[in-house]
Amino acid sequence: MNAKSLHNVMKRKLKQAGDKFPELKTLHAHEIKAKDAYPCVKYHILESILSKDVTISYIVVDLHYTEGRLLKDKNILYNFAAKILISKLITQNDEGKTVNILFDNKTTKIASKNSLREYIIADIVYEKGLDVNINFEYKDSDAGDAFIIQAADYVANGLYANYEYNNNIYKNLVKEKINVVQYISCLCGSR
């Protein structure tokens, strides 16, 4: 994926959306959040994202069947889900390479950032035995240069609409770019 190309298209499309719908620009300092965007804006931005060389991988956790203590500490649940997805994405094909992972700062608390990094490195490098250098970067989605995080937010929001509201218009749009989907229907622990 050419990150610069995705960055540029998001920057351009969000500016155009803000110019056409100025009320959307006033909600957040440097972004138009997907949850706040009008459906036509969201659809157009998703089309623009998908016009780039991207693949989409995601994980779905059914919270109705997730143990209560995992729901109480969302960082542990997030770290666990992130590790599962990332371990499916980083494979032997990546040996000898550097993999860059960009996380939305709002999804990880300060205290859990190092544990997330260490948790993933322990799994990939030590448990799977892969010779991979992993760089982690955390960026606030409201930062002036967080267009890649914002692109991921638009994709996630579109997929969320499918699972939460049975609205598949956005999922149908992205389905050709889907690489890995991981469903976790039960995080129940041992009883």
Q: What are the roles of these predicted feature ranges?
A:
Residues 1-191:
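Phosphate-ester processing/binding pockets and catalytic centers
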